């Protein structure tokens, strides 16, 4: 062995001549364990001693190390004594019984018989001291040398293991090198078994922990490929070697490993033979699927192997390999049962065999004469195959293999006959026998021997049998039967079959001439009549399964698919594809076209298509229907979701599953919707226009396809459900589960369902059908007689460093199995918290100690993941566990091993979660779940809330959940301190009995005000918070500044917390707040609640210790009511603490800003003399003409607001530009509206009038000059549309337009003053400031009101013509008639009524309202007393 390998830098010492390699490795492993390590001198002395020991007569095989130690001379140099002592210590002495095989016999594979001597266990591979740090890859000569050493030993035998160990020790291979070595040394069967065992060992090692292994760096196999990972690579080498010892026994040369596919044998028949052979010969516990999949490709004929290679399915699932071979094999066989050749008249020439005419030579019954003498016996009368010398000795003949394929050439090749002599080649059509899934290959044949009449019999056609088998009763009595050994699917047999060495004639129904066989097998038990390949090859017939082409099935066409509104079809361009993808896409489209799922199409609409490569190398057709889905209306799904399989009663023990293939491709698509499902197959390199197709059936990817299929399938199964009321049919998508109380009823139900599905044309997958007894796999779960488990459970590695993707994926798997995992929500919540706060998907998460402990808890709980099936006679009980992190609810039944379901519900995303509301929600959820899945509500609810807390909540809470809890209170059961019940043995979770402090009320709310307690008023805003503590007087008040990022709610919380901090000494407190949020928060806290995630979570948590144990009265105060009660005044005082004080304007400042009149200053706190002094001292008012010097005007005024307006346009120069000011003034109140424009047009006048109407209201009539803008057609039409009377006056006439002209002067004077104060003041600002001064500041001296107050006053009432108003206290006035130019005063007369702005004066037998400016007080002409009239008279001329 040492000569076969290349020498490393520090070569391993070679074995002495005559010593087996596996023995030498034992000495090397012992030498490497010396301390200190061995030297070259030690190895030299060891080799020298072993050379001498081998030649001694006491040398034993196997080696007895105790005897060997006695042969070592005393004072022998080196450390040979220590090496042999290590071997004696590691190898316990055993005596081999007589029945044990020799220990060095490499031909006996493991496991050995019970009493066989077991080879000493070799320690893990140790590399030599000073070995190089890098490994050496294999070379071909190295692999050949290793294979030559182990060629005569079975995998796993001692010699095999020692040889491989030495190779590993010399080359230090990586994981890839070990994989190459396994493929080179062992068969595909052994490699597959070794791979299964290695995966198991790696998983166990990763769980226990490996030195140097980093889970984040990839699998162990990937890390072991790194040549620098020397320690980790050696761990992998030991696992790889240990996998051989775990191989099942008898793995060398199994009988079923040599089963090959015949040249004409269908692939499905070949796979069926393999499957039967594996079922009969595979050791128990060995996985069958990988071996069957490996042999199905490696032992297939060349045609199927080439096909599977071209399709990329050499390692695909077995169903896909079968489908590929059945679909893509050449269709060169005619689907004809039996067809005879065309009859032609026999020739006139004599037959060259028998010399007689009247028949063809091929139909001659005489054997063809041999071409020459037999090469064995030189007899010219027979052929070589009929030579007696070949038949003389059959005892030493080789065993017959029944299941080996035929090696004959292709028998269906067309014969090329010479054309000449008037002879034509007969038209030969080969007989083919089509089979179906339900039909067995059986024919009625007749069997005869020489000098016997034919006997009819039913024969089974078997292309896997090499030789024909006949029953013994057909054999003539004088037959000479010979012993033989037959190797079949059940193993070798020496007694069941005999060989008959004489000709036998078999008459087939489709052949005139019989098939003549030189020999056949005789079944001594009269069980089998088989026509093998020897008979089928002579008649040139073959068996095949008739193809059943896929077609659009007779399923009902759906009436609604969501596109009935017929929107415009989408037009999404097809994107380019590389040649590989385009070729795969062309192949996929061809398959869909053959299956009649699509058809050529010419019309509008297009959606892109592309292929996706699966992990197994196959391609999948993807039609991007997102554009169509966006146009489609959602259909209401009849399915509420996947069923809970625990609802399957235990009294329905007999189960069967039915799986439908290509479910969505069975629903026909109406032609009107084809534009929405059209696509284009592009040409390579755009060499031509693409080919257009559209779906004939609803495709995958359409969002309503699952809903439509469920509706169709439910309609098909509805009659079956009515016919079998005692059975259950569970349907979800294309998976169907049947459950019945009796096997006979299940059989009838299965037949009924199968017939219904077959009638509608829905194909079923027979490979995936499962039935009891045994477990049933359905919807990812395993159904056992009394429980439900999941097919796969997530493997959790307890570690502190996780990537975000790993943790998210693991939690997703946990969510799938959470209904059966006995763990509380708190453990899951800890892991959910670890996902928060990350924005980069590539982040790495470091778990806290609490989260790592949660991982351990979940890992233990997964080992108990199991759920019980429903017992219909027992009630359903519920357990509710409330925790701050969420609610855990359990549904279970008494006397059962496992619960029905675990439900984990997170708390709602609110700042405070009252436990009473959570309990009510859990009750509603459990009742709904139980009623939906089990058909009954819960009998009782067990919860972890004390009776005292529940009673207090029901008596004091005003929440809506109180009504729900009272309704279900008769079903409540408190767990108590020491609970008793079925869950003590059922639920292995001790945390459910822990008390929750949060559920206890932290403080008590008093229903009335507490007399002896102080009062706390608090408030807050985004920048400040304040509180006042009052007890007969203000004890303390404080204003708190807040951070800039604070919200209003946080400000209110800050104020309340500061007030509570100051009120700590008092056991009771009255709290008055104007925040409904805080009032509700305190009331919920008093009842007991869980804190939720919020931005103010820390502030909410600080409330609990400050209120703990207090008695509190809470009162809500409405703010800004201006009431004078103490509560409102103290609340306003709290608000005032947060407001910055606003200093009122003094009269001097007000005049400096606005230049208002003295009456306005008196209205703002100045006396008459002070106001006059302020105006006189103003420099701006001195420079610019004061308002008092403007000329007076006399016009016709309105008697009420918005009766008569005057309008005018005045011009103003501002910064070298000329502006037009369109002024409107009400003649009753004098209120003004101004619009600044650049032009004076009809449109500008309309805009200005609209602006005035929006502020002052709509006038009854307007009065303007006769300018072109006011007389324009546009302005006149606008006034007519609003029913406004328009009249004109004489411009610049005091008696016609005096009011508006005076207003223009006042306005321009104020603007000039403002611009004098600030030259850069914008014109719009100056105009607005002027309007504020004129309308809202300046006070009219006649009525002591502003123009705006006068304009908003109540209008004067209308006076009836015939009735006089009631007389008031007499007042005498001199008056002038409005509108007249007479300067003389009339009167005095007594006023009948006075109002704001005018007085009612009798004039000439009628009554007129005279404005105050045309009135002056007079003295009664005949006073009744000596009272002197008021000598003060005032001119009521309006001033600005």
From Swiss-Prot:
GO cellular component: viral nucleocapsid
Cofactor note: Binds 2 magnesium ions for reverse transcriptase polymerase activity. Binds 2 magnesium ions for ribonuclease H (RNase H) activity.
Annotated motif PTAP/PSAP motif, positions: 98-101
Pfam families: Gag_p19, Gag_p24, Gag_p24_C, IN_DBD_C, Integrase_Zn, rve, RVP, RVT_1
Chain intervals with Pro residues compositional bias: 98-113
GO biological process: DNA integration; DNA recombination; establishment of integrated proviral latency; proteolysis; symbiont entry into host cell; symbiont-mediated suppression of host gene expression; viral genome integration into host DNA; viral translational frameshifting
Gene Ontology MF terms in the entry: aspartic-type endopeptidase activity; DNA binding; DNA-directed DNA polymerase activity; RNA stem-loop binding; RNA-directed DNA polymerase activity; RNA-DNA hybrid ribonuclease activity; structural molecule activity; zinc ion binding
Other facts noted in the record for this chain: The reverse transcriptase is an error-prone enzyme that lacks a proof-reading function. High mutations rate is a direct consequence of this characteristic. RT also displays frequent template switching leading to high recombination rate. Recombination mostly occurs between homologous regions of the two copackaged RNA genomes. If these two RNA molecules derive from different viral strains, reverse transcription will give rise to highly recombinated proviral DNAs.
UniProt protein name: Gag-Pro-Pol polyprotein
Organism in which the protein naturally occurs: Human T-cell leukemia virus 3 (strain Pyl43) (HTLV-3)
Designated gene of the protein: gag-pro-pol
